[in-house]
Each structure stands twice: as structure tokens, then as C-alpha cells.
Amino acid sequence: METVNPDDPRWAELDEKQDWREDGPFDFDEVDLDADEVDRLDFGTLIMTPFDEMNLQLQVDEDTQQVQAALVMHGESALEVAVFGAPASTSMAADIRRDMVEVTTQQGGDVQLAEGPFGTEIRRVIPLQNEEGETMYHVSRTWFAQGPRWLLRGVLMGEAGMTEGVDGPSAVLYEFFCNLVVRRDDSPRVPGDLIPMTIPAELLAQAPDELQQAQAEAQGQPPVAE
């Protein structure tokens, strides 16, 4: 198996080659969402544009009841998106590559770097064991887009995680990722710290009571009545 060198200068050159966010994802201050009549889902930190036959699952921390990530599914493919704090002017790309290569290697997995639609793309195959003790493999492709003090991560899984490029099973999820808008709050954050999302009112009514309570407290609203 080829040993991947995350510090190979070609990856830094690739990341600095162009503005990989020219066609999105966008910062909130870069767009005028009132200029069109598109229906969007506002998760506070992240604003999404839904698409036909989109399925959505929220990943919630059991202890804090904070929404950490969103899993968007289309057919046999899925895209997990999450937002993190980032420096105002320094790229995190090199550190991310280094950390992900190290972690994947420690897990006995295979990791490859390649040119993707947002600079360096990280492709991983990680061995896992199911309940019967059988070895299975988690295959994924990871995208990163960095904006003003934020970093957006997208992890492609399923059919989209096993293909290359942005056509075929990746096409719809690629367009979804490009259409994302990040609204970074003013709170000071250590680079790499997760920035939680808030659930839109139209979806919150369907959530469990404890999640509704936690979301109300996070937004400084009165506790939900029993």
C-alpha cells in the first residue's frame, strides 16, 4: 500500500491554486438570500437549499442535545455536513490532511489524496466490525471549504463515496454542498471547534421534547411548557 505524504508540497499548491469557493459554499455576507424566492432551511449556523427527494437526519449530541451535523441522503448516497471554527486568514488544510492521514493509518485504514472540486479531497477506506464480528469497510470522500473564521466539512458516503468527480451519484449532493450558506456567529472559537446548529421552527415541532427544550435554552427562549 502506498504511503501518503500529507506534507507533499503539491497538495498545498493545489489548495492555493484558485478560489475553490467561487461557486459556493458561501458566507452569509457574500449572498443576498432575499433576492430570490427559494425556500431554504435555516439551521442558524448553516442555511440549506432542499432538493427533490431529499432525506435529512440530524446528528445530536446525547449529553448536550446540540445538533452537531446534518446527514443529507439521496438515493444510495449520503453527505454529512458540519461547521467548525477556523482562523480568520490562515488555511487549515495542511493540518486537516495531516490529522486525517494519521488517524486513518492508526485505524488500519487506507487513505488517498486527490484533486477534488474544493481543492485536496481526502479518500478513506476504514475497516469496521459489525455485531457478528465480520469485517466491513467504511468508504468515504471528504471535502473542505474554508471561509471567514469557519470551515465547512462534507463527507460523501454510499455510492457517492465510492466514485470520483461530481457527476453520477455525486451530482445532486455536490450542488447541495455548493448552495450551502454559512452564518458564523461572533463567539470566539478555537480553530477546529464544532459550531452547533439550531433546528428551524418548522422542524422543531417534530423533535423529541428534550431536544426542543435544549434548543429553546440555546436560543435564550423560555423553557418549553410541559
What are these regions (language model features)?
Residues 81-83, 151-162:
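Short, well-ordered beta-strand elements
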Residues 1-69, 134, 159-226:
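N-terminal targeting sequences that direct proteins away from the cytosol to non-cytosolic compartments
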